[in-house]
Each structure stands twice: as structure tokens, then as C-alpha cells.
Amino acid sequence: MSTLTPREIVAELNKFVVGQEQAKRMVAVAVRNRWRRQHLPSDLRDEVSPKNIIMMGPTGVGKTEIARRLARLSGAPFIKVEATKFTEVGYVGRDVESMVRDLMEIGINLVRDEENARVRKAAEAAAESRLMDLLLPNSFGQEERASTREKLLQQFRLGFLDEREVEMEVTEQGGGGVDIFAIPGMEQMGGQVKDMFSKAFPPKHSRRKMKIRDAFNVLVQEESGKLVDQDALSQRAKERVEQTGIIFIDEIDKIASSSQNRTSDISREGVQRDLLPIVEGSSVNTKYGMIRTDHILFIAAGAFHFSKPSDMIPELQGRFPLRVELQALGREEFLRILTEPDNALTKQYEALLGTEQIRLSFTMDGLEEIAAFAEDINSRTENIGARRLYTIMEKILADISFDAPDMPGAQIVVNKDYVVEHLQDVRGDQDLTQYIL
């Protein structure tokens, strides 16, 4: 679990998300409270539940990005789901429990990656040994074999044998070649049927020719599987999900009916009632066992243009005690987004075109013009926040991106005149629908 303080968490989030200080502080405290809870006496620890959060704000202001970066910082299993994809029990569609099952799968993969990294050196050593056995026939004498083996090993480590082919036995998963296509809303049943076939049909072994570098990767995976205790892995993942998991429920406002339409939206209220036991704490059956949701952190988000949090059923409102409103982005924020974050769009395009030996640079007046244009379009059409910058940048750099392979060594400076020239055909055009993502 992350030991970062709230101030350190906010500082890390500032590297990727511009503004929205109140939201950053709120989620930072939520993560720190998890660390604090782990240091409580066991009898009190179970009584402390996470304070779930509702983020309110228009699209493209950083709601999802804050939650995603927060999960990476804390090393927590994280999943984003859309509330509109779920249906009330009894209707065709995904049931709300599927998000917990999906979160558990993410937790399994997260812990498996950590375990594979932990045993990587031992797995590579075992894989090298098996690879040398494949390359050296048994006809060699003991001393000659040892000497040749050492030389081959050095050549392999230097990459001299990567393109050479070797024939080896590959283990294929059981299942009899049967692919299971799950019916929407019945994914768990599809997984159970697939597991049943996997157990009924033992793994198959086949000989296959492949390049040595590919064979080495296959052998490393096999050896890692032998070194990692799968039962312990599942137990660790279960604990990680139950204690640190984060579920981000987007578009929560779409299932909150306004008072005028409440009578015609029975199914929306049904989804809310199905969500209620998951959010307040219950047990969900997965193929890895029962998962308790009591201490999973739920972060809900929505624009709330046509509804408000008070339109949700009272029981669900009470399970999201913390609420924060994210502000719409303007020219100043767009300029900061283009310059400040570690993954700023300008840095991404400079790196992308740098692979074609093109030196791309942006002047401050050029960036200011881009920011002003983004604000203008957002005010005249749908406000999609920072996502507007993606469309504008693609429009500005479309010709360069297309011609890049034919102009290696070129130096391109994107200044105000360059931006105006490439956007002049749409600046006065009232039909800007092509710029709405």
C-alpha cells in the first residue's frame, strides 16, 4: 500500500492533471485514510469504511484522469465502468456485480505481474538452462559440452543467436479448442463453462519451430508459472482488491432521474437499487471465491447537466458522502495543459515526429492561439473540455504527420502564424460538427 502523504499525492497528480485542486485534495485524503485504517487495532479496523466520492463536472475536465492516476500511485486495482451499461436484475444486459468480478481479474493480473517480476531472475536462469539443453545434442562429451555450453550462453546473452530457429515442445492450455462466446449479461456463466472445458481436456503438448528470442520468452513464462504459487497469488489479489480496490463509476448522472421523469424511468431506479448493496458492502461470488466490497473505494462521476445528486435514491446518496465540483476549463487551463504535464500533448507530438527525424517545436504565441481557439469552439458548440485540444492538434499537424517520412531532418516551428494558417478554413465556419469528438 502507498505510504504517500496527501501533499505528496497531490504533487504527483499535478504532473498529469491541471487545476481541480479541491478534487485532488479529496481523493488524496481518501487514499491516505486507507493507510491510516491499516494501522488501527483489528477490532476498530473493520468498523472504518471508505468515504465514497461523487465528482461533478462537464466532460474533459479531468475526472477520470484523477482517479486513474490515483490508482497507479497507490498500486491499487482500478476499473472504470459506465453506469449506463448496467441493467436491473431480470433484464438483458450486464449486472452490477460484474464490475467486482472484473476488478478481481485486474487484481489477479496486477499481483501476477508483481510475482513474475519477483521471480524474473530465477525464471530467466532456468529458461537459459533449458534453452542450452535444446541447442546442445547429448553426443558431446562432458567437458566439451560444458565448454560449448558456456560459449553458446555468452553468444545468446549478447543477442547473436536471436534469429536462429529452434524446435521445442510447447504446452497449450486445455479446452479442446472450444471458444466460449458469452451472452451479454452472462459473462460469469461463459467463464465457468470455459473453466469446465479446460479441466475436462488436459493441456496439449506440441512441437513447434520458433526463433530463439521467442522461445526464450515462452520458457520464461513457463518457469515463472512453476515458481509462483497460484493459490497464494489468488489470496494476495483477493486481499488487495478488498482492501485497496477502486471502482470508478462514470455517467452516474444518467441513471439519476429528475423529478419530472421519475415515473417513466423505473429501470434507472432499479440499477440504483442494484448498486446499493455493492456500494454499502456485500459479498460477490467470483471464480476466485467471495469478494467483500465493504472497503472498496467507489468514485462516481457525472456531468449532472439535467439532473443532480439529490435525484438519486436517498439510500444511494448516503453512500457517497463526499462531493466535489470540478470547474470547466478555459484558455489559461488549456495553455497549462499544453505545457505543464509530463505527458503534455506537445511533448507527445514532438516525440512521435522525432521518430521520423523531424524536429518539431512550439512557440508560446502558437500555444496561446491553440488555447484560445479551443476555448472559442467549446463556447460555440458542445463543451468537451481538454479533449478539444486533441482535435485541434490533429488538424494543425495533419499535413506534417502525412508527409513526415518524406522530409527527414526538417525543422518545424509551430507559431501563431502557423496555427492561424492551418485553422483559417474553420475559424469563420459556423458548422463545426466535425470538431466534436
UniProtKB/Swiss-Prot annotation:
Binding site for ATP: 18, 60-65, 250, 315, 387
Family: Belongs to the ClpX chaperone family. HslU subfamily.
Protein name (Swiss-Prot/TrEMBL): ATP-dependent protease ATPase subunit HslU
HAMAP family (UniProt xref): HslU
Record function comment: ATPase subunit of a proteasome-like degradation complex; this subunit has chaperone activity. The binding of ATP and its subsequent hydrolysis by HslU are essential for unfolding of protein substrates subsequently hydrolyzed by HslV. HslU recognizes the N-terminal part of its protein substrates and unfolds these before they are guided to HslV for hydrolysis.
CC terms in the record's Gene Ontology section: HslUV protease complex
Top-level taxonomy: Bacteria, Pseudomonadati, Thermodesulfobacteriota, Desulfovibrionia, Desulfovibrionales
Subunit structure: A double ring-shaped homohexamer of HslV is capped on each side by a ring-shaped HslU homohexamer. The assembly of the HslU/HslV complex is dependent on binding of ATP.
